[in-house]
């Protein structure tokens, strides 16, 4: 576990002052995210990802923010009034998250249903392409769809070096041993960027409940989302995990694999921010 890590800055602080982007209310109950000259399909990908995750609500999945409309440069979503979490809400969220994962995906690396463009990972101001594909095994998906592409991008931006790729290749070589029986898990319907800032808590409907926002939704491994919850700290994480385990027990050794699943987002932080995240990535690989 690396819960002691903290983001060096919020996305909005990192890119403060950049024009042509933002988030604002556009009416009662409606919220607009916008960015001029956004990458092709960026907001459609997020919108379809939210809808895809939301489809799992019929199977007991968590509430997902409603999507009203999207265009090339904007996404209109439901406004949610935030409040603090409770132990019961956290446990209920864990149960619901397990059900969302159980809703599944066609392959590891699948894009949200109905979307065939580029998927993205990262902040509104600097999203990077996230590979999609039809990998049948989790090790190949993690190696070819996640770790290698992100480290290559870090090298292109001169934040990472050949040494980091060597460390990454060593991890990839060890994946069969690291994954263990988790390699047998079927593709899950994952949020893909489930740090604490993308889990809102609200009492809009009465009892406190979690609402998911800002996904990088895809077919992945269920432990990805749990590792992201752990990465920068999450209120009542123990209760969330207890709820999750009650609905879908995790494969033995899942705690030891948390660092593995955190490599991709930390490599992403190397790409976006550089600095101390590079040494952190190297330490995690070792």
Spans of model-derived segments:
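ATP/Mg2+ or Mg2+-diphosphate-binding catalytic cores
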Residues: 269-286
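Active-site Asp-x-Gly
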Residues: 131-134, 138-143, 152, 185-189, ...
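An alpha-helical support segment within catalytic cores of ATP-dependent transferases
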Residues: 105-191, 202-205
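Hydrophobic alpha-helical segments that form the core
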Residues: 259-267
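ATP-binding glycine-rich phosphate-binding loop
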Residues: 17-26
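ATP-binding pocket architecture of kinase catalytic cores
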Residues: 29-137
């Amino acid at each position: 576990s690396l819960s002691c890590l903290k983001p060096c800055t919020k996305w909005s602080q990192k890119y403060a002052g950049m024009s042509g982007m933002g988030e604002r209310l556009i009416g009662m109950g409606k919220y607009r995210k916008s960015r001029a000259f956004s990458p092709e399909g960026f907001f459609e990908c997020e919108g379809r990802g939210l809808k895809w995750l939301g489809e799992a609500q019929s199977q007991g999945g968590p509430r997902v923010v409603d999507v009203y409309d999207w265009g090339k440069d904007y996404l209109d979503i439901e406004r949610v009034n935030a409040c603090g979490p409770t132990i019961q809400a956290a446990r209920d969220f864990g149960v619901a998250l397990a059900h969302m994962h159980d809703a599944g995906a066609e392959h590891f690396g699948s894009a949200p249903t109905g979307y065939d463009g580029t998927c993205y990972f990262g902040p509104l101001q600097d999203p990077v392409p996230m590979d999609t594909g039809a990998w049948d095994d989790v090790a190949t998906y993690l190696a070819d769809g996640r770790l290698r592409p992100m480290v290559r991008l870090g090298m292109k931006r001169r934040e990472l070096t050949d040494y980091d790729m060597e460390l990454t290749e060593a991890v990839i070589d060890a994946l069969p041993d690291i994954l263990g029986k988790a390699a047998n898990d079927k593709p899950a319907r994952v949020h893909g960027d489930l740090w604490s800032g993308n889990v809102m808590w609200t009492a809009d409907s009465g009892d406190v409940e979690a609402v998911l926002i800002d996904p990088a939704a895809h077919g992945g491994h269920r432990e990805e989302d749990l590792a992201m919850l752990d990465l920068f700290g999450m209120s009542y994480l123990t209760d969330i995990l207890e709820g999750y385990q009650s609905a879908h027990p995790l494969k033995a050794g899942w705690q030891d694999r948390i660092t593995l699943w955190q490599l991709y987002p930390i490599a992403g932080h190397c790409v976006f921010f550089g600095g101390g995240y590079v040494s952190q990535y190297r330490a995690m690989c070792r």
